[in-house]
Amino acid sequence: MGDLFSLFWEVDPPPIPVNCAIPNQDYECWKDDSCGTIGSFLLWYFVIVFVLMFFSRASVWMSEDKKDEGSGTSTSVRKASKETSCKRQSKDSAWDPSQTMKKPKQNQLTPVTNSEVALVNAYPEQRRARRQSQFNEVNQNQHDSDTTEYGSEESNSEASSWKESESEHHPSPDSIKRRKMAQRQRNLGSYQMSERHCLHCKALRTNEWLAHHSRQKPSVTPPMKRDSQEESSISDINKKFSKF
């Protein structure tokens, strides 16, 4: 029963009562004000996109025009240079039909411009500059390596001298003992030498004194005996002093 009633309702809906008014769609859109905002947003969106496209295309057109103008000026300059070179060649050499018949390929070649000649002349100069720069770099690297080696040698020498100075400032006990022994030996040697010198001087003085006094005393003995006695006395004194 429910299914039949639903089918009937879909085929023949119930009539709308007279008191209910049909709502106007335009009035509702105006009341909500949502349709107007959406439409204005879409309109301005398309306008902005169109303006951006126009400016982008205008910049592209301007760049193309500049390129065309530059290419036109370059072609005009090339043509003028070619014409001037042809005129110079025609002035330098007179026209000979036999030469043109013999050498048609040479006439077909385009004349050389000044820019091409400048490029050809600049190529060896560029090569020389590159070689010079490479040579300078190699010399600089060698100089840097030499300076580093010299600096390392200086640092090593400074380190060794610093170690030696430290060892001198802080001597070991063995070195102290050695120094003391050497000083003692030196002192003993100097004392012995001074004693020897003093004894020798005393012996000489005594000999002089004895010789002086022996000359003053009168003696009956002949001079040969006196000399022998003096020599024996001097030898005895020297022996005593040497034993002492």
Swiss-Prot record:
Its GO CC terms?
Answer: membrane
Q: Where are the bilayer-spanning segments?
A: 35-55
Name the InterPro entries on file.
Answer: DUF4636
Subcellular location as annotated:
Membrane
The way it spans or sits in the membrane comes to: Single-pass membrane protein
Disordered as annotated region, ranges: 65-114, 126-191, 210-244
Basic and acidic residues: compositionally biased ranges: 80-94, 161-176
Q: What is its main location?
A: membrane
Tell me the superkingdom of the source: Eukaryota
UniProt lists compositionally biased (Polar residues) regions at: 96-114, 132-142
The protein's UniProt keywords, in alphabetical order, are: Membrane, Transmembrane, Transmembrane helix
Q: What is this protein called?
A: Serine-rich single-pass membrane protein 1
